[in-house]
């Protein structure tokens, strides 16, 4: 496993591997595919490179069913820009630490990505949402007690979930709903009391990656 004692160096090494495999200098946007979202990458455009996650520094084969095992570069049909599709995600409950959880996002930034789209499979408390309903995250409650930020870096999270990007999504599909997402540590599921005190969406991924 790659040494993550220097997260920035590890991300640069992974980004170099990914960009070289795709034959490009940089990527434009990153997409992290959560449980059940694997097929979304096929709708974006032409895949020009696909690397097994285990062959990229700092990544490993997914430990959870429903996640892809590759890092894919897709040329978006409409714009010609390059998307880095991260099919492999590390969850905190796997015991690899917060640096491993944030490694994918740090790698995306090192690869040149200036925008990030996170997806996950989570529970919803709105009874109007049928299973599989896509819902935007408007804000989050981090109940894990952990952060990917180290040292005296006081990052402003006011607009963490971009109002601009959410507006674009709603322009495309006005029926999209949104709500506050609460993340627990896992791997166990939440108690009924924990569910009642949390947000309207509940899961075990995304918050630390977004930070």
Cite the ranges covered by each PLM segment:
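A generic, residue-level signal for flexible/boundary positions that often mark functional hotspots
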Residues: 50, 151, 155, 176-178, ...
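Metabolite-binding pocket within alpha/beta catalytic cores that recognizes anionic/polar moieties
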Residues: 2-157
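Residue-level detector of family-conserved "landmark" positions at structurally sensitive sites
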Residues: 29, 118, 178-180, 208
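Residue-level detector of conserved catalytic or cofactor/ligand-binding positions
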Residues: 202-211
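Active-site rim beta-loop-alpha module in soluble metabolic enzymes
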Residues: 159-200
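Residue-level marker of alpha-helix boundaries and capping positions
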Residues: 5, 95, 160, 185-186, ...
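Short Gly/charged-rich anion-binding patches and loops
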Residues: 13, 103-106, 164, 168, ...
């Amino acid at each position: 496993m790659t040494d993550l004692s220097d997260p920035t160096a590890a991300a640069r090494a992974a980004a170099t591997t990914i960009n070289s495999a795709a034959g490009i200098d940089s990527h434009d946007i990153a997409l992290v595919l959560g449980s059940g979202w694997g097929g979304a990458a096929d709708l974006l455009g032409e895949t020009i490179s696909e690397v097994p996650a285990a062959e990229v520094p700092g990544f490993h084969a997914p430990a959870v069913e429903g996640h892809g095992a590759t890092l894919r570069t897709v040329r978006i049909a409409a714009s010609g820009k390059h998307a880095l599709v991260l099919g492999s995600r590390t969850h905190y409950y796997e015991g690899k630490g917060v640096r491993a959880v944030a490694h994918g996002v740090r790698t995306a930034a090192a690869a040149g990505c200036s925008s990030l789209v996170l997806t996950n499979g989570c529970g919803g408390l709105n009874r109007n949402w049928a299973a599989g309903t896509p819902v935007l995250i408007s804000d989050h409650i981090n109940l894990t007690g952990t952060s990917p930020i180290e040292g005296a870096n006081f990052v402003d999270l006011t607009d963490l979930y971009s109002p601009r990007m959410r507006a674009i999504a709603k322009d495309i599909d006005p029926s999209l709903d949104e709500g506050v997402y609460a993340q627990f540590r896992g791997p166990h599921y939440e108690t009924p009391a924990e569910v009642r005190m949390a947000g309207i969406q509940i899961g075990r991924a995304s918050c630390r990656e977004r930070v």
